[in-house]
Amino acid sequence: AHFATTLEMLKTFEWEERKGKYLLRREPVGVCGLITPWNWPINQISCKVAPALAAGCTMVLKPSEVAPVNGIILAEVLHAAGVPAGVFNLVNGDGPNVGEAMSSHPDIHMMSFTGSTRAGVLVAKAAADTVKRVAQELGGKSANIVLEDADLEKAVSGGVSQIFTNSGQSCNAPTRMLVPQASHAQALEIAKKAAASAKP
């Protein structure tokens, strides 16, 4: 859905807009630093690289040091597709060294980071001295709020099922379930049963 939405938006996006006697022109932000997490690696990488390319930005990608292969393969694919040298750049390494160097580098104009809140704070602090834009998707593990009029069996068992998707490694897994106090005991039994029947 990310790519379909991006492609659809690009078809009608107004790069220039006349407002009275003024012309508003939207231009690429410049070099984008992209730091991606270990879970859903090719999806996370693509969701940062595709919009940057579409906007006309060059980029430096640092994939997670524990899941670097997808970034390497994408670099090979982009090279084979004829993306000019220097448009897509790949660096491997850890956050404290490579991530910090990217975030603080004066020639990187925007940082896009997906990962932990702890690391996000470090990215924002490192980027502050150069006053670059910072876009972050932090933390994860979403709340699953079940209201009084919900079908409790369906909501709880469905929520438990979603927790185990992608081996439980999804940042949007609804792992914090909030139910009405009066339904707590019943919800707990449904959750136990659903978890016990989950298939690896």
Question: What kind of region is each of these model predictions?
Answer:
Residues 1-49, 83, 88:
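N-terminal Rossmann NAD(P)-binding subdomain characteristic of aldehyde/semialdehyde dehydrogenases
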